[in-house]
Amino acid sequence: MLLALFQWIAEDIRAFNVFSYITLRTMLAALTALSISFLIGPAMIRSLTTRKVGQSVRSDGPQSHLTKAGTPTMGGALILMAVIITTLLWADLSNRYIWLVLLTTLGFGAIGWVDDYRKVVQHNSKGLPASAKFFWQSIIALLVAVYLAMTAELPQHTDMIVPFFKEVAIPLGSFLFIILTYLVIVGSSNAVNLTDGLDGLAIMPTVMISGALAIFAYVAGHAIFAKYLGIPHIPSAGELAVFCGALAGAGLAFLWFNANPAEVFMGDVGALALGAALGVITVIVRQEIVLVIMGGVFVMEALSVMIQVASFKLFGRRVFRMAPLHHHYELKGWKENQVVVRFWIITIILVLIGLSTLKLR
């Protein structure tokens, strides 16, 4: 909206052309989302507290978590609100990728909202049945995958890029591309959701990965930079940097309220949506393997659950003291803040490795 306004003004006042630069709008998006979250956050937390939208705590989990019972949840709605408003303000609304990411984020957010609502408002401990949740996630992810496959401008836009190797890509074709896209979006969404079990644990890696994806999106959308760095040029993908900036800004503000001891939890409405957003942006800029690297913490958390379930069903024994992985370390004696900060440090290292793939080829 603001971009269109400034472009109109720029016809008479050239100084306003500065707002056409994606880099500036990305920074402004981050600051705008940060400000919106700080302004709305306290009122939203008070409203959730008044309505008794509190989180229930697993009785078989770490005893230190019992004090968290009743903490307001569904705070992810704050992030989504800030991101959507900011993106509508600063992004180019004629860009198809912006709408694709917004709609995907909203779709997965709606699934999470229904799940949270049934748990904390209707007091249904199971929330949205797993089968229903998976069904709707699959529908949205497949629609996105088919759309991207059908609108790919070049065959290379459906190849899987292998990092650290110059001009090495695996041709997938439409069918395998759709499967990969589906797995990335659904997998990323659920991995972030599984990670969101400690104060600040999921949101900070999300912020860091969003910042990195903003760089990848900008480079992929810039023909000269993409050619120089040896990555696929995806026309119009650069605009996704604005969305990533908004996500990073909103996430940082949310961390202010989510840091230990948390005043509010993200809930499924936030975790599912943010994970899906990271997944679809990654697919658009063709950096699926890099996401696995940068999101290593999310990957470890998801794998720990799968390994735990498979081991117990097949052999009747558990590999970890408790899954997801962060609870395993808590039960080993790590303090909550130790787990969170150490996982943040791991993410910083992995994000730097991911960014290094731009040059190390």
Curated annotation (Swiss-Prot):
Primary location recorded for the protein, binned into one broad class: membrane
Compartment(s): Cell inner membrane
Highest rank taxon of the organism: Bacteria
Membrane topology category: Multi-pass membrane protein
Biological processes per GO annotation: cell division; cell wall organization; peptidoglycan biosynthetic process; regulation of cell shape
Keyword Metal-binding in annotation: yes
Protein name stated in the entry: Phospho-N-acetylmuramoyl-pentapeptide-transferase
